[in-house]
């Protein structure tokens, strides 16, 4: 059985929660997690996810000793797939008919970031989210 950890996204200028970033299926044997995020619709397409995602990934790879973070995104969700690309994730493959939604099966894009790649990613300015 795995563990789940979540962080609430709270813009500094409003102090109001607008989403969550988290990991589930934490495999302590091989230091691997599956990431997820949900933001309020009015914050999608803004830099809020990039900032929060970088903070969480920095914590996972830096303080928690995670080796690999995976993300499985519906192939139809262009915005989420683009956000992971901007974070520096590598598209590793396509999981065919891997997610059920609306009574149908849909493909998912498999993304990953490994600790050695993340160490090459520049730090983010974090004062806008806490």
Locations of regions flagged by a protein language model:
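Active-site rim helix/loop that mediates acceptor-substrate recognition in acyltransferases
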Residues: 1-4
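Acyl-donor (CoA/ACP) binding surface of acyl/acetyltransferases
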Residues: 6, 10-130
């Amino acid at each position: 059985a795995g563990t789940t950890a979540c962080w609430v996204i709270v813009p500094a200028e409003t102090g109001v929660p607008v989403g969550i970033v988290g990991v589930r299926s934490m495999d302590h044997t091989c230091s691997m997690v599956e990431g997820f995020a949900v933001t309020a619709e009015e914050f999608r397409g803004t830099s809020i996810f990039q900032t929060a995602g970088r903070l969480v990934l920095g914590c996972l790879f830096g303080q928690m000793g995670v080796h690999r973070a995976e993300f499985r995104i519906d192939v139809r969700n262009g915005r989420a797939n683009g956000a992971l690309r901007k974070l520096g994730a590598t598209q590793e493959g396509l999981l065919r008919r891997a997610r059920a939604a609306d009574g149908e099966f849909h493909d998912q894009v498999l993304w990953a970031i490994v600790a050695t790649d993340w160490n090459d990613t520049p730090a983010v300015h974090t004062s806008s989210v806490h």
